[in-house]
Amino acid sequence: MISIFKILSSPKPATTTTNIINPINIINGIRYFSSNQEDYPLFKKPVFNGKVLRGGRKVFKNDLIYSKKESHYNNNNNSNNNSNNNNNNNNSNNRNNNNFSNNRNNNNNRNNNNNNSNRNNNNSNDNNFRNNNNNNRRTEYYKNDFDSSKYISNKPEIRIFDLHEQAVYGINPVWVALSSGNRTFNALYVCGTLLPKLKELGIDIKNIENSKREYISDFDHNYGRETNQIEDENQDEQYSNQHDEQEQNEYEEEQEEEKVQEEEEDNNNNNNIKKTTFNRYNDRKNLVALKEIVKNSFKLKIPVRSVNKGTLDSFSKGRPHQGIILDASPLTLLNIDFLEKFDINERVNKRMNGGGGGGGGGGGNKINNDKYPLWLVLDELWDPQNVGAIIRNCSFFNIDGVVISNKNSSPITPAASKSSSGACESFVINRTESIEGFLKSSQRNGWNVVGTSLDDLNENQPCLDINQIKLDQPTILILGNEGFGLKPSVLEICNKTIKIVGGNYKIDSLNVSVTSGILIHTLLSSGTLPK
């Protein structure tokens, strides 16, 4: 019992304490702070360049690390000195625990005297450091790069060369859009690398505006902008121009090499027959069409501006633009509620007179006057590229018209126009609020509604193969969504449903744009108007 009591009542061993570095001691720009949470929360994280290296709060300009106020800083020094005294006393008591009481007292007195002198020295050094280096420590040790002189105000600024509406990109879409009356135009943007070729083709490039990445404001051209920012922008422009010049120089070198090869081939040819070589650059850019585009823009008084390729990429959102973009208004679509009753005599008269026009709906497209009218309805298609490819098929086969649902369908975007190779710009496209209402109203006027599906309508109306149907009356062909096809409410209105039979059971359907081309070609080839 005695031994146990001695063990329980024995003094606790002294806890080991870490050496606390005085705040004025700085090692490679790293500061350490007191662990006394009463005076100041624990913060022993190294700080460099205004950031905490291993967690903790960030330190910014005019932020005192070890004191939110000067009083905290003073209290922190006192707490540090007291903690140093306590630690020294505890260490001395533990080391001299087996000595006599007189020696212990002498040691304590000696330690106290030393601590008092050290404390006075620390306080004097601390005051000198704070008074002499108060400003230098914030910039030298924190290394904060913040400079209020470089701050740019939020004054509204507008780039001179910027899009106002939609970006119609691609040579064919731009070419067709300029000749049609479905859009209004703001500006034409041409890649700077095409200017030398346009000059060779006889275009006066002096009328083409050059981009300098300039900004305009309501009051001052350079309001709120520092010289460093302007220099950076000029450097960026110089780099882009150098890059464009390198591309142009490479192209010119290739052209010279091709000319040399052609001359050598001509000299070696006894018949003096000039051999033509395929020029990828001319084929890709289609410089002849580009020349007509620039000429038409000058005639229509549309500003033509030269920009670098990066600007064109940003306008087209990374899609291939072929070096030309037209800033234009959205495409105009016509509203339609139903198709009128078809008059076969009017169709025959137009065929005899060589005229064109819509078949029953007034579509305005050039159509096949020797065939019954065929209209295509797109019900809730989501992909604009599919919509563009389908309209391209419709324009190629000269059907009477296209109707798009105004709800839950992809609009005619620049991506659809590019996918249609410009067909969306000239082919008249109609839209309706209700597909079901449009079909029912047209059906009452004698139109045959044909849907596309893989399943039968019912037991009495099986789904027919495409070869089992003929275009022997005015017909409306419906194509459904890429995923789920036609809606049940639309299938109930259909007089017939057709499908394309494939040979691979693992793939049960085709892309909707491919399906449209096959169905339109098959229907137009299956019947003609009576003579």
Swiss-Prot record:
Residues 70-141, 230-277 are annotated as: Disordered. Residues 247-267 have a biased composition (Acidic residues). GO terms for biological process: rRNA modification. It is an enzyme of class 2 (transferase). Coiled coil: none annotated. GO terms for cellular component: mitochondrion. Its EC number is 2.1.1.-. Keywords: Methyltransferase, Mitochondrion, rRNA processing, S-adenosyl-L-methionine, Transferase, Transit peptide. InterPro entries: Alpha/beta_knot_MTases, MRM1, MRM1_MeTrfase_dom, Ribosomal_eL30-like_sf, SpoU_MeTrfase, SpoU_subst-bd, tRNA_m1G_MTases_N. Residues 1-40 form a transit peptide. It is found in: Mitochondrion. One of its GO terms (molecular function) is RNA binding. Residues 74-136 have a biased composition (Low complexity). It catalyses: a uridine in rRNA + S-adenosyl-L-methionine = a 2'-O-methyluridine in rRNA + S-adenosyl-L-homocysteine + H(+). S-adenosyl-L-methionine-dependent 2'-O-ribose methyltransferase that catalyzes the formation of a 2'-O-methylguanosine in the mitochondrial large subunit ribosomal RNA (mtLSU rRNA), a universally conserved modification in the peptidyl transferase domain of the mtLSU rRNA. Belongs to the class IV-like SAM-binding methyltransferase superfamily. RNA methyltransferase TrmH family. PANTHER family: RRNA METHYLTRANSFERASE 1, MITOCHONDRIAL (PTHR46103:SF1). This is rRNA methyltransferase 1, mitochondrial. It comes from Dictyostelium discoideum.
